[in-house]
Amino acid sequence: MRSTFLAKPHEIQRNWYIVDATDVPLGRLSSVVATVLRGKNKPTFTPSVDTGDFVIVINADKVQLTGKKATDKTYYHHSGYPGGLKARKAGTLREKNPKKLIELSVQGMLPKNTLGRAQGLKLHVYASGEEVGQSAQKPQVLNIKDLL
């Protein structure tokens, strides 16, 4: 009888991928990135172990918001104080902090536990014109448009 394969944290090979977000819909980009961060694209995927890879997203300010999401979709956060609810439209968030828009979208597709937070730390987002600091890792290009 065969036993089920369980990945061990010290045996995991992690790769680096770079993704260009130019003219890619936000949700489709986020779902592919979340899949790679979790490690579900690998045959060694184990749900209780962080088997995912590192992902670098460039040109975050050029991501596409389809439909009326730029004016209708609202992101909320609360300061913890009475009356501290803050709201920001997706279009405004893309203009002022495009990194946060992609990070929030990907984080919403990861598990809501300690493992999901650890997987979210492997995401690095850069707007256009910013210097990518992970070039020493020699990231492989992951073409989202071919996967869609």
Swiss-Prot record:
This protein is one of the early assembly proteins of the 50S ribosomal subunit, although it is not seen to bind rRNA by itself. It is important during the early stages of 50S assembly. The keyword Amino-acid biosynthesis does not apply. One of its GO terms (molecular function) is structural constituent of ribosome. It comes from the Bacteria. Belongs to the universal ribosomal protein uL13 family. InterPro entries: Ribosomal_uL13 (IPR005822), Ribosomal_uL13_bac-type (IPR005823), Ribosomal_uL13_sf (IPR036899). Disulfide bonds: none annotated. Signal peptide: none annotated. The keyword Ribonucleoprotein applies. One of its GO terms (biological process) is negative regulation of translation. HAMAP family: Ribosomal_uL13 (MF_01366). It comes from Oenococcus oeni (strain ATCC BAA-331 / PSU-1). PANTHER family: LARGE RIBOSOMAL SUBUNIT PROTEIN UL13M, RIBOSOMAL PROTEIN L13. This is Large ribosomal subunit protein uL13. GO terms for cellular component: cytosolic large ribosomal subunit. Keywords: Ribonucleoprotein, Ribosomal protein. Part of the 50S ribosomal subunit.
